[in-house]
Amino acid sequence: MIFHDITTIIRFAIRKNNADKIIFFIENLSHFRFIESIFDYFFKNNYDITVISLENPFGTRDYNNNNLSLVLLKDEKDKITTLKNLKGKLFITTTPSIGTPIFPKSQIIPKEDRPKYLYFFHSLVSPNEMYVKNSFKNFDYIFSPSDIITEQLNFLVSNKTEIFTTGYLLFNNIEVGNYSKDFDDKVLIAPTWGEKGVSQLMN
């Protein structure tokens, strides 16, 4: 199971770094589903969790625990200030480009109080094609969804980054569907995410 493999590696990272506080950076509700199973695991096991987000990432889900704190960022300035002053052991996110001016790492002293940074892919696109330069260079741990992406990542990270090929978490949710109706007179358009996804295809 993909989930089992990932939690095993994260538990190792927790022991290695003596982690007593886990931080999740989740941009919004649409990003939460990519690491929901990971979050649920730590939530149910009563880890000390801080979630940093641009909006409530849980939607209608009910998470109520004294060990969970939610930090909703007011604006870009608040985001940068918060990230620069983080204290914790592990920082888990699906957002690339950590360590850049728009997504900075913690700068607190002593350095031992700064978290290790873990990245989960929220898509299966090539890291060579869809990401800006240095999107992966500053992560400590990266969980790759495939062997091909792992091969590409090896040229995009620092020599300190550890890459684990674990698979794509959403594949744990695949269900067999029974679709028997054919639509010979229709075309399926599947644009990528973003406001201009459809308009770019139409033009």
Predicted segments — roles?
Residues 31-46, 169-203:
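Conserved catalytic-core segment of nucleotide-activated headgroup transferases in glycan assembly
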Residues 66-77, 90-100, 110-173:
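Active-site-proximal region of nucleotide-activated glycan assembly enzymes
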Residues 1-88:
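N-terminal pre-catalytic "stem/leader" segment of glycosyltransferase-like enzymes
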Residues 43-44, 83-87, 101-116:
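Glycosyltransferases and closely related glycan-assembly transferases
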Residues 25-29, 52-56, 94-97, 121-123, ...:
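Structural motif
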Residues 14-22, 113-115, 181-186:
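A short, charged/proline- and glycine-enriched loop
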Residues 31-34, 56-63, 100-103, 150-153, ...:
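Short, charged/polar "capping" segments at the starts of alpha-helices
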Residues 23, 48-51, 118, 141, ...:
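A structural signal for isolated positions on well-ordered beta-strands in alpha/beta enzyme cores
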